[in-house]
């Protein structure tokens, strides 16, 4: 195992994720077929140098430097492998917009881990990368499906080990994700939540989660509809999203089975059958337009392959 050569390069593709899906707060997440691409290469310089090049206007506020999430994740790999850090450059084709509740930070973490690991010959297993990703992010619901793909339920067992269960999502269920021009940070969304919740609310969520998972497995719209209800976080977060209630109502009236805040928001997730997707998308965009917010609402599939890397020609 050796340090990467100057100019050695890998390309990492990492999917967007939608977390919580209503009742699965901080434990349920799904990968979507919308990818960020990170071209990472070693450059001249010491271990505190990281250069970031963003393709796309959404990332104009993002900066390089040693505190960048991509580089922080890369440093964790090198430390675990017993290697000294090196200078890196990352050129990012940004399709997953930051601060929209689609796991943008998770894509940065996973790319940094996977890219750095690939550059030094993959000394760390995927299980170790998963452990590092959760530790950096602080919660598993985005980084786990971002790395592994699919619909993932993640929980910390009594042994303190993270356990991941891959859940079924029938292909007939489509995800319409309405992505607004406004932003909402995860920290702000978390501050809106209470420190404690009633036991009755927790019980409702447990039941709803069971219904939702069975609905996603079978494609039963009634179960999805009954399952996409939450009492732990959404009652406190919808008020932070301008026009969010109207967008949700418009999606339901257009034929969606259920609606939820995607991650911490402000994007809104609607689940529906395939032939309803275009109508649900149009209705959500129109509702946000009426609230004075520009948006787009792609109809997306579950991404099942997770993140992957490939070598690229040295520069």
From Swiss-Prot:
Key words of the record: Amino-acid biosynthesis, ATP-binding, Cytoplasm, Kinase, Nucleotide-binding, Threonine biosynthesis, Transferase
Gene3D superfamilies in UniProt: 3.30.230.10, GHMP kinase, C-terminal domain
Segments passing through the bilayer: none
Localization: Cytoplasm
Reaction(s) this enzyme catalyzes, per UniProt: L-homoserine + ATP = O-phospho-L-homoserine + ADP + H(+)
SUPFAM superfamilies: GHMP Kinase, C-terminal domain (SSF55060), Ribosomal protein S5 domain 2-like (SSF54211)
Family, as annotated: Belongs to the GHMP kinase family. Homoserine kinase subfamily.
Known function: Catalyzes the ATP-dependent phosphorylation of L-homoserine to L-homoserine phosphate.
Protein name, per record: Homoserine kinase
Lineage per the UniProt record: Bacteria, Bacillati, Cyanobacteriota, Cyanophyceae, Synechococcales
Gene (UniProt): thrB
């Amino acid at each position: 195992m050796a340090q990467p050569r100057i100019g050695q390069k890998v390309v990492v593709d990492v999917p967007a994720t939608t977390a919580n899906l209503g009742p699965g707060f901080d434990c349920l997440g799904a990968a979507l077929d919308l990818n960020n691409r990170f071209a990472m290469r070693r450059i001249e310089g010491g271990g505190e140098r990281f250069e970031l090049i963003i393709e796309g206007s959404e990332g104009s506020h993002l900066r390089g430097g040693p505190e960048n999430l991509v580089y922080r994740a890369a440093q964790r790999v090198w430390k675990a492998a017993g290697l000294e850090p090196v200078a890196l450059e990352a050129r990012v084709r940004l399709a997953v917009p930051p601060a929209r509740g689609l796991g943008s930070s998770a894509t940065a973490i996973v790319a940094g881990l996977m890219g750095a690991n690939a550059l030094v010959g993959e000394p760390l297993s995927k299980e170790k990368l998963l452990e590092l990703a959760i530790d950096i992010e602080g919660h598993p619901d985005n980084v786990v499906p971002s790395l592994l793909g699919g619909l993932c339920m993640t929980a910390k067992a009594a042994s303190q080990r993270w356990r991941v269960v891959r859940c079924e999502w029938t292909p007939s269920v489509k995800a319409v994700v309405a992505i607004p021009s406004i932003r909402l940070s995860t920290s702000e969304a978390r501050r809106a939540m209470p420190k404690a919740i009633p036991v009755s609310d927790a019980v409702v969520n447990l039941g709803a989660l069971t219904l939702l998972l069975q609905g996603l497995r079978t494609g039963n719209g009634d179960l999805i509809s009954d399952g996409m209800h939450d009492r732990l976080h959404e009652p406190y977060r919808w008020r932070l999203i301008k026009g969010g209630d109207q967008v949700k109502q418009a999606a339901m009236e257009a034929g969606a089975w259920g609606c939820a805040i995607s991650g911490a928001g402000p994007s809104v997730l609607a689940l529906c059958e395939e032939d309803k997707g275009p109508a649900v998308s149009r209705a959500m965009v129109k509702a946000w337009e009426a609230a004075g917010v520009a948006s787009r609402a792609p109809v997306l599939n579950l991404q099942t392959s997770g993140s992957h890397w490939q070598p690229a020609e040295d520069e």
